[in-house]
């Protein structure tokens, strides 16, 4: 469980165009100038909200293009027009930020693309993760009632205190290790997220 440096987003406008354009140059979907501006505004709002959900991430101006942007995620897969984005995100770390030991082989949509189509190809919503963590998280959305969610690997500031503990027991000839979060020095919201993630 740790954080990653923010991915570069200087090319998000051209990545959006690439996702919505066939290799022969024909448009999968031709974004209007209003839609393009709205998508780029969603990206800025996402950064401002530190990756947390909010109604401003689903503007009405994007109703017609949402599905096309979500489907554009297929271009981030191996062999797709945005495969280099996938490769650079996966190359940014050797360890899954959710569990701290798995090899990142997948990209997790921190805010699920099923609910936040506009963010389906936004690099800062795509977190390199191992398969088991990505599968376990699936559509967990931060702020869901009763579910604290996971830390955001790009935006979460973690305190410089040791908060993870390992209790080691040797019982009946077997080693038993149990991990826990020591919450005493942590913000209660962060402590709940870390406990949920553990």
Walk through the language-model features, giving the residues of each.
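N-terminal accessory alpha/beta regions
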Residues: 2-82
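Short secondary-structure junctions and interdomain/linker hinges
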Residues: 26, 76, 92, 161-162
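Generic detector of short, locally flexible boundary/turn motifs and exposed helical patches
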Residues: 60-63, 91-96, 131-133, 143
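Mixed-charge, polar/low-complexity N-terminal
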Residues: 71, 77-80, 86, 92, ...
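Short cysteine-rich loop/turn motifs with clustered Cys
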Residues: 85-106, 130
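Glycine- and acidic-residue-rich phosphate-binding/metal-coordinating active-site segment common to enzymes
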Residues: 104-186
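An accessory alpha-helical subdomain
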Residues: 191-198
């Amino acid at each position: 469980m740790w954080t990653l440096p923010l991915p570069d987003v200087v090319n998000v406008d051209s990545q959006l165009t690439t996702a919505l354009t066939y290799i022969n140059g024909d448009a999968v979907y031709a974004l209007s100038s209003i839609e393009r501006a709205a998508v780029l505004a969603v990206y800025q709002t996402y950064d401002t909200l530190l990756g947390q959900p909010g109604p401003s991430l689903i503007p009405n101006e994007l109703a017609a293009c949402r599905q096309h942007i979500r489907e554009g995620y297929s271009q981030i897969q191996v062999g797709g027009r945005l495969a280099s984005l996938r490769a650079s995100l996966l190359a940014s770390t050797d360890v899954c930020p959710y569990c701290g030991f798995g090899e990142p082989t997948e990209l997790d949509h921190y805010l699920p693309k099923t609910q936040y189509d506009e963010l389906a190809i936004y690099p800062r919503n795509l977190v390199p993760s191992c398969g088991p963590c990505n599968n376990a998280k699936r559509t967990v959305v931060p702020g869901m009632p009763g579910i604290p969610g996971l830390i955001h690997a790009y935006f979460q500031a973690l305190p410089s205190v040791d908060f993870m503990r390992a209790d080691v027991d040797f019982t009946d000839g077997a080693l038993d290790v149990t991990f826990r979060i020591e919450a005493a020095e942590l913000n209660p919201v962060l402590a709940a997220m870390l406990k949920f993630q553990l």
